[in-house]
Amino acid sequence: MTQTDSKATQGDQLPGGILMKAIVYTQYGPPDVLQLKEVAKPTPKDKEVLIRIDATTVTAADCELRSLKLPIWLRLPIRIYLGLIRPRNKILGQDLAGEIEAVGKEVTRFKKGDQVFGWTGFRLGAYAEYTCLSEDGVLAIKPATMTYEEAAAVPLGGLNALHFLRNGNVQSGQKVLIQGAGGSIGTFAVQLAKYFGAEVTAVDSTGKLDMLRSIGADHVIDYTQEDFTKNGETYDVIFDVVGKSSFTRSVRSLKHNGRYLLANPRLSQMVRGRWTSRRSSKQVIVGAASEKTEDLLFLKELIEAGKIQSVIDRGYPLEHIAEAHRYVDTGHKKGNVVITVE
């Protein structure tokens, strides 16, 4: 159970004493560091909107930022950005969906009452009743066909999947394999690769295979029973979402001019990837999704056209977010874990 503290920390309370509920963490560590507190309700600046959040998510990325259990090469840069000893930004959360409650005086794209969904990126702040975002941020009107919970599950997974598949130049008729296909990024990658016309092989654990078939995977592989790098198949694109595939064997499983996409690379994979890309016809591509509103709008169009959907495994109320983090830490979630904010 998330701990509750009804006192705002010093300096948090705004004139007038307007407070909101938020999940706060003041140290890195296990899910129990997450505490339900009352903090100052933010006020939008001239070019910002104030969003009343109805739903957010718990992703593997949120858990990594909470615990700092990251690849070695990322730990120091992330600590420098987030806070060396303790987090500077004490409210996690990147995905959100909700309603605009107020707008700054220079805002033109949105108005009060608009139902929106968006991504805060490393600004974080979505584990709360309210947050402010720039009107030029990754924010758009919510798909008309989706609930707040379904819409909140789109941004991080959808934007990352779209980023990598575009960088991998996925084309109609190509063979694409997605390792770790059952998570938030992977489920969107399967659907987007199918939309782009690819023949998709989805790799994950036994309990996720039926779900992966249901969202369009042409072939599924249970990694607990079969190593895809040893079945003799070759692929135009291999997208490793989770960083668990063998670098050497994956590269060997690529066709001539194939692309190996790494969403969560180890340092050794990055070094070897540069060498492989320079010395062979095969390309190794790493990186993170850029924050582009037009990409979110593209995903919205596909959603409203019925081409892609969010996959939701479980839902929790904000007060039980520590329990949600414990579940995501197991690595067994199917698609997304959604948090409702009331």
Model-flagged regions — what are they?
Residues 3, 7-17, 292-342:
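C-terminal hydrophobic helical "lid"/dimerization subdomain
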Residues 230-237:
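A short acidic, Gly/Pro-enriched loop at the edge of an enzyme's catalytic core
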Residues 151-222:
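Mid-domain Rossmann-like dinucleotide-binding core that forms the NAD(H)/NADP(H) cofactor-binding site
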Residues 40-57, 71-122:
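Glycine-rich beta-strand-centered segment in the early N-terminal region that forms part
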Residues 115, 175, 258-259:
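Short glycine-centered segments of the SAM/dcSAM-binding site in methyltransferase folds
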Residues 204, 242-308, 340-342:
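Glycine-rich phosphate-binding loop and adjacent beta-alpha segment
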Residues 122-135:
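A structural motif shared across PLP-dependent enzymes of the aminotransferase-like
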